[in-house]
């Protein structure tokens, strides 16, 4: 599919906690097709895909990266509200994991090869960052690419003085339209490396350049992207990514030779699973890659995953057996903890809010300045829209009230300048400049607009008087003539 004399790219889609699927795919590519990673022109990623792309380009330990994903998901599941709990700081957790796994010269390896998808806050446009000046700048770019508004916080992070949010909002799969781009997505669809769901539904949902087949399994995956599933589910997703990567390499004839799966000592006979893999590869070549290869055994997959990731997957399946964990898993203790949530949650929220406020103090001036600018921009935008809307209704309103008459001839007697000045209003006669006239005109417009929204409810004085029906007027009463005074 991609000969060595051509160029190609690799693009990882954003998927939240399902990024452990990317770890399985990246492990497969690095182990079975290292030339595919080493000779790729660019490796792109958005949101969680940017984290895997960064680890793949910089040569970081993928096993440790996958273990960090599982540990973060387990830490989020411990809380009542999961990742939305006030004490869970996603940005701080991602920054700490990147500081731990990335080497010191990671920015030198990433510049020019790694592309991180970002969404600019000012206009909502997509930006792909490919050059980094330091390790801190590379980490900050990943933090910006994974920052989901409201989910991770209210104030977006900044990179080189510009505010950015999650790159998946504007472009979740960078450069997907190019034919030489290998697209990786944990959602079944039209991506090159993705799960193959046995669904007959042909409907497709395309979300910011990501193809998602409309079926129940994808709906389940979408529900677990922001709220982490159980460790066993993450383990299966990582193994699924490894399987799908192998399927892609076999279908396109990109498996590196000698195959690490088949490299055994001469004295040791091939294992049954290796024989099955050989037979499956031959069957795939005979059928032209149309039939799906049967998935290899789980033990066989776990043997060739990175050792750190293998240990993390095994530890995720084992539950601790200490006394405290046993007591906390008892039903009465769990019921008591659930009943205490209305009392413990406000206390935990207050403590976490205080800690975040102290951590926010160094960035307060810059963030306050940004919020002030955004508030001013929003108010200015609303004023322009309101003025434009009122300006469209004003001419029609005036045309219904003002009647213009066209004169057919000039007046017989020309008016003098004094007569013309008498016709103009007094405020126009007394104005000294054109600016004064325009200011008065705007004042009249405001008074006229205020009059449009006022309703005259005043009644005349005789409106509420009781009127007698019309008829013959009653005769005045006749009084007897009074005797003259003595």
Swiss-Prot record:
Catalytic activity: a triacylglycerol + H2O = a diacylglycerol + a fatty acid + H(+); a triacylglycerol + H2O = a 1,2-diacylglycerol + a fatty acid + H(+); a triacylglycerol + H2O = a 1,3-diacylglycerol + a fatty acid + H(+); a triacyl-sn-glycerol + H2O = a 1,3-diacyl-sn-glycerol + a fatty acid + H(+)
Keyword Glycoprotein: yes
Sequence ranges on the Cytoplasmic membrane side: 1-8, 64-137, 356-486
CDD domains: Pat_PNPLA2
GO molecular function: diolein transacylation activity; mono-olein transacylation activity; phospholipase A2 activity; retinyl-palmitate esterase activity; triacylglycerol lipase activity
Entry EC no(s): 3.1.1.3, 3.1.1.4
UniProt keyword terms in alphabetical order: Cell membrane, Cytoplasm, Glycoprotein, Hydrolase, Isopeptide bond, Lipid degradation, Lipid droplet, Lipid metabolism, Membrane, Phosphoprotein, Signal-anchor, Transmembrane, Transmembrane helix, Ubl conjugation
Modified residues (Phosphoserine): 377, 399, 409, 433
Regions that span the bilayer: 9-29, 43-63, 138-158, 335-355
Entry-listed glycosylation sites: 39
Cellular compartments per GO CC: cytoplasm; lipid droplet; membrane; plasma membrane
Motif (GXGXXG): 14-19
GO biological process: diacylglycerol biosynthetic process; intracellular triglyceride homeostasis; lipid droplet fusion; lipid homeostasis; negative regulation of triglyceride storage; positive regulation of triglyceride catabolic process; triglyceride catabolic process
Covalent cross-link (Glycyl lysine isopeptide (Lys-Gly) (interchain with G-Cter in ubiquitin)), residues: 92
Pathway of action: Glycerolipid metabolism; triacylglycerol degradation
Subcellular location: Lipid droplet; Cell membrane; Cytoplasm
Extracellular side: 30-42, 159-334
Protein name as catalogued: Patatin-like phospholipase domain-containing protein 2
């Amino acid at each position: 599919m991609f000969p060595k004399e051509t160029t190609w790219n690799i693009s990882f889609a954003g998927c939240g906690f399902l990024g452990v699927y990317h770890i399985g795919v990246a492990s497969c590519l690095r182990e079975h097709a290292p030339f595919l990673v080493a000779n790729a022109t660019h490796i792109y990623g958005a949101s969680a895909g940017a984290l895997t792309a960064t680890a793949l380009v910089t040569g970081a330990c993928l096993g440790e990266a996958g273990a960090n994903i599982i540990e973060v998901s387990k830490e989020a599941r411990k809380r009542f509200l999961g990742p939305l709990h006030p004490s869970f700081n996603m940005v701080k957790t991602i920054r700490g994991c990147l500081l731990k796994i990335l080497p010191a010269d990671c920015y030198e390896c990433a510049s020019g090869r790694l592309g991180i998808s970002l969404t600019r806050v000012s206009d909502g446009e997509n930006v792909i960052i490919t050059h980094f000046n330091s390790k801190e700048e590379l980490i900050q770019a990943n933090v910006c690419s994974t920052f989901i508004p409201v989910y991770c916080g209210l104030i977006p992070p900044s990179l080189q003085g510009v505010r950015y949010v999650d790159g998946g909002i504007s472009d979740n799969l960078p450069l997907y339209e190019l034919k030489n781009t290998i697209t990786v997505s944990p959602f079944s669809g039209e991506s090159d490396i993705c799960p193959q769901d046995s669904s007959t539904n042909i409907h497709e949902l395309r979300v910011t350049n990501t193809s998602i087949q409309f079926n129940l399994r994808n709906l389940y995956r979408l529900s677990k992207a922001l709220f982490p599933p159980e460790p066993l589910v993450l383990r299966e997703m990582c193994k699924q990514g490894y399987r799908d990567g192998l399927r892609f390499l076999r279908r396109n004839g990109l498996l590196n030779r000698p195959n690490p799966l088949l490299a055994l000592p001469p004295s040791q006979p091939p294992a049954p699973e290796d024989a099955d893999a050989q037979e499956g590869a031959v069957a795939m070549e005979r059928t032209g890659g149309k039939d799906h290869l049967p998935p290899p055994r789980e033990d066989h997959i776990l043997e060739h995953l990175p050792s750190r990731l293998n240990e993390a997957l095994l530890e995720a399946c084992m539950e601790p057996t200490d006394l405290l964990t046993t007591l906390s898993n008892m039903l009465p203790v769990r019921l008591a903890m659930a009943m205490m949530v209305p009392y413990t949650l406000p206390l935990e929220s207050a403590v976490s809010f205080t800690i975040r406020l102290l951590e926010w103090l160094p960035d307060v001036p810059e963030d306050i300045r940004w919020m002030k600018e955004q508030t001013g921009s929003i108010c200015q935008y609303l004023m322009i829209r309101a003025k434009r809307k009122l300006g469209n209704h004003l001419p029609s309103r005036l045309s219904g009230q003002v009647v213009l008459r066209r004169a057919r001839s000039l007046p017989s007697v020309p008016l003098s300048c004094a007569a013309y000045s008498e016709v103009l209003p007094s405020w126009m006669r007394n104005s000294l400049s054109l600016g004064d006239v325009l200011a008065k005109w705007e004042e009249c417009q405001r008074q006229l607009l205020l009059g449009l929204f006022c309703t005259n409810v005043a009644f005349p004085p005789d409106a509420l008087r009781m009127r007698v029906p019309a008829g013959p007027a009653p005769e005045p009463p006749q009084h007897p003539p009074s005797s003259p005074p003595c």
